[in-house]
């Protein structure tokens, strides 16, 4: 029988998980940060989901979170009208950046010297993190609250999305280069540096555009409203999740749906591939993060594939090296998504 998905579940949040981001690969592996309406962003080991720490200091829902490339700094965007920068090693708050309204999105430059923010006041702000007392540079032009803002093209350009528009800006001149208009709300945006690809979701559509010109490349239609999508680092697969609680996996080249399965017990708000492409993470209204294998049955992280000769001649089956727990909801997902037997119900406790 074909093996299918059973995820690792990362518990600890008490409200919906609305954003997540991976660091780059460091000498210590890679890391995962999550933003949650409980106001307590969390840092985890990326390949296992093991909880490392919680960043304490926000006084409202945290809408956006990111890590710099080497996972030494974190940044968060919150409903308390602030963005914060943190030491991701010690957990200490390094600076608080006051805004005039709710902040929704944050992104570091590649050298971690500048932070880009956006939110409900419709302004993009660029902070020089080496001069925390200096006023930020501001870019105006959006006509509604900014949902996502990202550096692109080696930090020479900026991509930003509001309700129904995606805009491309020149960093040096602070002027708009081009914009894309949609007939419905843009739900998410992801930038892939290799190949300069922009992934945009709106309605049931997953669209791919050139990040340099905003010209269309291709698009897929999903069976349900999609809130987030992510492109595999080697551009093999696309994963997406949305309002029907399901995760969808597509072949990027052909657009063929390869898998679909129940992923959570609430709408899925965010999906991202790990930097090595071995797994992807999803965050949901149900308050959990879940980690999924890109190739099921492969030995990786907490997953271990038992070969036939190691298992009394039976078919190979994935096992998870993790203490046994009793979580009924994961058993339900396992029964729906798997034709194989797993050694335990995985759970990461924060």
UniProtKB/Swiss-Prot annotation:
Keywords: Cytoplasm, mRNA processing, mRNA splicing, Nucleus, Phosphoprotein, Repeat, WD repeat. The keyword Chloroplast does not apply. One of its GO terms (biological process) is negative regulation of transcription by RNA polymerase II. It is found in: Cytoplasm; Nucleus. WD repeats lie at residues 12-56, 57-96, 98-137, 141-179, 180-212, 221-262, 263-302. Coiled coil: none annotated. Pfam families: WD40 (PF00400). GO terms for cellular component: cytosol; nucleus; SMN complex; SMN-Sm protein complex. The modification Phosphoserine is found at residues 312, 335, 338. Part of the core SMN complex that contains SMN1, GEMIN2/SIP1, DDX20/GEMIN3, GEMIN4, GEMIN5, GEMIN6, GEMIN7, GEMIN8 and STRAP/UNRIP. Part of the SMN-Sm complex that contains SMN1, GEMIN2/SIP1, DDX20/GEMIN3, GEMIN4, GEMIN5, GEMIN6, GEMIN7, GEMIN8, STRAP/UNRIP and the Sm proteins SNRPB, SNRPD1, SNRPD2, SNRPD3, SNRPE, SNRPF and SNRPG. Interacts directly with GEMIN6 and GEMIN7. Associates with the SMN complex in the cytoplasm but not in the nucleus. Also interacts with CSDE1/UNR and MAWBP. Interacts with PDPK1. Interacts with TRIM48. The SMN complex catalyzes the assembly of small nuclear ribonucleoproteins (snRNPs), the building blocks of the spliceosome, and thereby plays an important role in the splicing of cellular pre-mRNAs. Most spliceosomal snRNPs contain a common set of Sm proteins SNRPB, SNRPD1, SNRPD2, SNRPD3, SNRPE, SNRPF and SNRPG that assemble in a heptameric protein ring on the Sm site of the small nuclear RNA to form the core snRNP (Sm core). This is Serine-threonine kinase receptor-associated protein. It comes from Bos taurus (Bovine).
